[in-house]
């Protein structure tokens, strides 16, 4: 009720003015926070604190179930207090659950079995938060991250000593510098790739997906990105500490893996090319089994590059401390296996040999018979043993047809109908539903960018989709500023062949186990339907702790699932030093599927989570 000195109209005007001022200040602080949140040190934490205090409700809103969700019944019961997860011991800061060193040494060394995945049983799983090392800082933005890594993030100097003469990595002040050298490219990765490009069509989009077996610090993959080629690099967790960790700190795709006794976690015909640059894989061992596995994942018409022993043995036999006869015999044996796989040697000069796989088996001229693999599903590879057999080409109707289907050049390949779909090989997916999936994920990613304006910038370089489906999320996000590891859960429909046919990369994985990577290697994780999928297979807590392990401090996770599932997820992550917001579906509050956005707080070993790292100035683009 207004007084004569303050009539009601004035009160309303002042209230409106006050509201506008508050909203204006709120938005100002939000934008200031976003601008400051360059991903480096105190800028991140200050911006997060400002945003937390201001809480602009017109930018990001919490769900209000009561007035809107009449069709979604939320049980009204007292929420149990969330479990607060404690930090793991600091010595576990680089813990990799399925490649843990003490456990690995209990397994045979034969065929590199001890370097393969050996995950802990349920009663030995860690249920604590893996800490970041003291001084941890958000990586430099791409492309600077290709050349520089903060020492505090991966404090391992062994490679600077062991590979000092090979220009792999140098230690300068408080950073590692990666000059782009390598054992087999002393003139730099660019010069090496240019030589390959004189034979292989690397620059025109014909080659989009590549495999680097035994990648070192992934300089080849890093410089292939300049040619718009995505390289899946892998190396074991071995004496060269942190090879894969360095690769991911640089913003280059990589996993911990080895060619050993089990099949690689990729579908058949996934890669346009593969290379071994002094990777030390014994290609002639076990009757050529490892080359047969490379052949399985290499597309018809694809290329295999071998640089290093035994190529150019006449020059290097003394350096390698091996006899001419031994090296000559090894090269002849490799070439014989290649012929049996229907590969043709296209080039040999200096330290490099290049082979090309025939486009189908009609032009094969094998001098010796080979055993073909009898398994019906060549993509059923999870924990399956490698066999000494050749994966047969898909059938063709004429000599000019590419077995398995010809792919368009990239980027047209990204949205073209993949052969697996046009041939009806993916149950329940046709050309129409594929196009619907494209449109759906374009819409959803646009919505994500409204939630967080830094999505699509260099702030989030390493991205993972935990349940990738047809690769729609990654395709909608496609940009030189980021790359996406598309994970196909082993208990879901097998669509990884579609992901690769679109010119994207990915891997099979079971989320009841640890992922084959180091801690703190992803900036942004997307989890659509993951927890509905796994809620009866293993503990959601274990999947979330693994998500926390591989997520960088101040990285984000976007969960998309049924609201009751997300409520269960939220109760767990509230005890994991994450900040969360539960939000409506893009199509409105009546849709039972919701979105949970989470940010991992910055904290390091030994502190209480309130400290910030030192600053490193840079801006996202």
Curated annotation (Swiss-Prot):
Topology Cytoplasmic: residue spans: 1-14
Membrane topology: Single-pass type II membrane protein
Methyltransferase found in the keyword field: yes
Cited Pfam families: Methyltransf_29
Swiss-Prot/TrEMBL keywords: Glycoprotein, Golgi apparatus, Membrane, Methyltransferase, Signal-anchor, Transferase, Transmembrane, Transmembrane helix
Transmembrane parts of this sequence: 15-35
GO molecular-function terms, A-Z: methyltransferase activity
Homology family: Belongs to the methyltransferase superfamily.
Protein name: Probable methyltransferase PMT14
Organism phylogeny: Eukaryota, Viridiplantae, Streptophyta, Embryophyta, Tracheophyta
